[in-house]
Amino acid sequence: MVESALVDWSRLQFALTAGYHWIFVPLTLGLAVVMATMETIYVINGDEFWKKTAKFWMKLFAINFAVGIATGIILEFEFGTNWSNYSWFVGDIFGAPLAIEGIFAFFMEATFFAVMFFGWEKVGKRFHLASTWFTGIGAAISAVWILVANSWMQHPVGMEFNPDTVRHEMVDFWALVLNPVAVSKFFHSWFSGWMTGAIFVIGISCWYLLRGRERRFALSSIRVASIVGIVGTLLVMFSGDSSAVHVSKYQPMKLAAAEGLEEGGTRAPFSIVPGVEVPGVLSILATHDLDGYVPGINNILDGYTTPEGDVYLSAEEKMERGKTAIEAFGTYRTLKQSDPEAAQEARAVLDENIDYFGYGYIDSREELVPNVPLVYWAFRIMVGFGGLLLCLMFVVLWAERRKRLENMRWLQWASLLSIPLVYIAGQAGWIVAEAGRQPWVIEGLLPTKAAVSSVSVGAVQTTFFLFVAIFTLFLAIEIRILIKAIKEGPKTEIE
């Protein structure tokens, strides 16, 4: 039996390293779009001001990009150190997108990044502009493959279980890539990066206005960033709608936890906060139908039948079928040499129950319910801060276009102080995605407690605190370098 402390510390360590890494990723994705847009303006109109503006944000991009790479490398090693059972069980599938990301996307980023950062006076304007855009595209492609891998864990497709190797093996690469969960998750994450980059640029630009510096630079940056951010946030909402439908279909327990919905039904209400609900809205979000059926936590545990006649087994039935699958697997492995005919009979039983294999490791129905308060409030923080920041960007853009922003110091302060909010919203979104699918590391196939390595709790605790120190140092170094670069400024003023 795996120690619960080992599972908890392994999860905590991965949450720590992934959370730190995600501080840098969305800014890379979003700042790439903002600075590429600025350089495009420079290439079109030839105004050196826009070149200097783009170069300044490019400097901040480079700092963030470098630290993001350093924090990301550690994550991949953790699969082998803390999650070796997981790596063996699905390495054939999970490793493919990670390998593609490392070989193709990273080298694409590195190549064009070098041209972008060092090639201003060495290549033509249009070639340099293309390099800037391709750096951003390369970063987005990196995100594609990472999110394809993550989405497969949320909704496993394109594979089959091989009892001879005790591994899930890929049988359809394109099913993996075009997984509907992966498509919506990529766009949701990418566009949230636009939002992060925009809020960062707006906040820093407002700092210059508060200091009475770099007036034209600040206002021009705010204009571009606000447009990018508004477009990105609206697209985040659109892709989030798509994600809600997929979560409702493939991970109903996650949706029920995010809404604190104990008893489901048709015209299910959307919970704003506990005790404040809007009737029917959850059904619309989850099924695009006011009369759509949304199961609650108890319905999922007890088993339910949809109005369309689809039958879903109870937790106990799934656990029983899972134990049957595990027993048949053991019988097949034992008899495949001595009694091939009996082994094939066991294989048939295994194949019949393989979809519930992971449930055989679950000891009680309570294990199937994630941390409801954590998921519930994380979802509200994500949505609430996202809506607040969208309103802020609309107001900032309106004030800038009306030439009122310079006199609205309260709005400048609000913009500067909003920078932490966009990061909190992003982290909250990942809490919903990852905590909401517990107890599974692979939905329905492999519970988290069966995925950990056979290492001591002390070893994981030691590396956890070591990573806390290292990652905090990375973050402190980046913040210090960013502050120094920001204080130096873009030096675009000629007034």
Label for each model-derived stretch:
Residues 1-19, 46-53, 77-99, 151-187, ...:
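Membrane-interface interhelical loops and short amphipathic "cap" helices
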Residues 15, 180-193, 278-385, 464:
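Individual transmembrane alpha-helix segments
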Residues 45-66, 89-95, 99, 119-137, ...:
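Membrane-interfacial loop-to-helix junctions in multi-pass inner-membrane proteins
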Residues 62-71, 133-153, 229-240, 332-335, ...:
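Hydrophobic alpha-helical membrane-insertion segments
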Residues 64-134, 151, 435-438:
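Membrane-interface helix-loop-helix modules in multi-pass inner-membrane proteins
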Residues 113-122, 127-136, 144-153, 173, ...:
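Internal alpha-helical transmembrane segments
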Residues 149, 229-324:
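Aromatic-rich transmembrane-lumenal/periplasmic boundary elements in polytopic membrane proteins
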Residues 367-430, 461-485:
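C-terminal substrate/ligand-recognition segments
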